[in-house]
Amino acid sequence: MAAVAWAQDKAPPVEPETIPAAPAIVPYDDKLLRLAEVIGSVHYLRTLCKAPGGSEWRSDMQRLLDSETKDEPQRKEKLTAAFNHGYRAFASVYTDCTPSAIVAEERYRNEGATLATEITSRFGN
């Protein structure tokens, strides 16, 4: 009977703390964050102006997240926040499609193309 009492008094084993993995340091993250912000802006403006393929920008962002942040939730959060920031920045300024909204969309689309080219030419495989 003493052995049974001794087994019941024993504390459960202490599990070691799980330390989250440090986020990966990616040399092109700054440019990638800017690209995500630009994609969010272009997505909003193209949808606002009913431009062809307006919804494909969000799909492009999802593909970017899937390929770049597969097992990195912190990076995914940062890129998603950048996309949302770009979207909201123009949503707070433009509620109608105006000539300046069209010009802004074109400029941002060109910036996005430049960023994508820089990232892939410098860091692509």
Model feature map: region roles:
Residues 2-7:
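N-terminal signal peptide c-region/cleavage motif recognized by signal peptidases
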Residues 53-125:
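Compact alpha-helical subdomains of small soluble proteins
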Residues 8-63, 113-125:
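N-terminal secretory signal peptides
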